Amino acid sequence: QPENAARELAGSVNVRIALFLLVHMPLAYAMEAFWPLATAHAVLVLLAGIRWAWLGRTRQVLYCLSYIAGFEVLWRMTEARVFWEYGKYALALVVLMALFAEWRRSDARLRTVLPVILLAAMVPAVALAVLQFSPAEAFDQLSFNLSAYLALGAAALYCWERPVDRPTAANLLLALMAPIVGILFLASFSTITQIGVDTFATASSWIRSGDFGANQVSNVLSLGALAGVILLIILPRAQGARLLIGALTVAMVIQGILTFSRGGLYSLILAGLAFGLNLLTTPGARGRFLLLIAVFVALVFGVIYPWLNDLSTGAVTARFEDLDTTGRLELARADLMAFQDSPVLGAGVGGSMPYHIYVFGEDVGTHTEYTRLLAEHGLFGILIMALMGWMLLRRYLGNAPGLGRAISAAMAIWTLSVMAHSATRIVVIPFALVLAFLAWRLDEEREPASLAGDNGLPAPTTAVAPTRVR
């Protein structure tokens, strides 16, 4: 009897989800304390992804891509000894291996040529960068500005119209959310342990971002919260897991506010609205979403906001009432000057920097991806933006009304809004865009019986690589 009870407990969906999410708190702490663990983790996750790609395990490849995207900032925070853009190249490498293995085993062909055209449109600006800079400087500029597009193009080729059912969707979002739970833990731990040092100045906070860049942490927390909201709608019957996910989602919103980096919260609100509006035609999901919104609004405005504002002696209100763009408008104006000077081919990748120095007084990279595309790619930048818009529209309309379109719209709006204030600094930005390209097959009338079985939510030791490194 005890053995059967233990086996039943171990097989519980609630327990498996809770263990998978919560194990990333001590894992993040250990990685921060011991950088070789962070490095080994980054390498082993990539190796696991390559292995799954080579074996043609499509679902595991998708989970690994999601996990890499969620973990990139945590690897940076814990000082894993991998290069800065490792997450983007790791994601691209796994995808390219998966495509090669898929084509090797069958007569499969490209589902769409649009990502190829998008990447080809960047060639003129790449050529200009190679001609203008030394080889080392050209590589740095190309890697910093375009590695996200390499990841986007490769992942779009793999994920375009690829069907995702409800259990796979749940796993995919859990794989994305789990490492962000680790980021949440480090940021919260830093906030609590340094509360006497923190002055709550009305500027983005390094301390309340886990001693890391507030912009990146805020954006990742907002995507983790968005994943949590979607999971609360699509997870059936797992009440205990949904309570935990709800608590983690609220915690991510709170910590996102405390970073004082406003962009992530704004993007979350916009994406949440897009998600909710697309559920209005789906009775079951609509009811759950409206209940979720009612509870969330009551918590935020009745409890969380007054508490945070009192804790910060009014700094929260002052920060979010401040309309200063912290130099983004000046950088965007510099980009537009570069576009006016070179409207056809653009200034080349990295070619907008002299304009930034002229207008802003510092050698600062742009935070608005759309103006960077104009400045450095010229008319080809307009083509790139048009292609991204067309791809998103096609896949949005290709998904069925209801949950499918809701997820596609939420991911698209989150990405497009983040690109307006944070460019493509982190790999979750192109990855979230790629999630909008999937064919979400979330049948409202069918409860997935496999969710608690072998084809459902995987145990932490088999879903993704992280729990193999402890």
List where the protein language model places each region.
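Membrane-interface helix-loop-helix junctions at transmembrane boundaries of multi-pass membrane enzymes
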Residues: 52-61, 102-114, 231-247, 282-290, ...
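Long extracytoplasmic/lumenal interhelical loops at the membrane interface
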Residues: 307-377, 396-399, 403
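Alpha-helical transmembrane segments of multi-pass inner-membrane proteins
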Residues: 126, 150-158, 168-202, 211-281, ...
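A membrane-periplasm/extracellular boundary helix in multi-pass inner-membrane enzymes
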Residues: 186-194, 254, 258-259, 276-320, ...
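Aromatic-anchored transmembrane helix interface
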Residues: 83-97, 112-128, 135-161, 174-185, ...
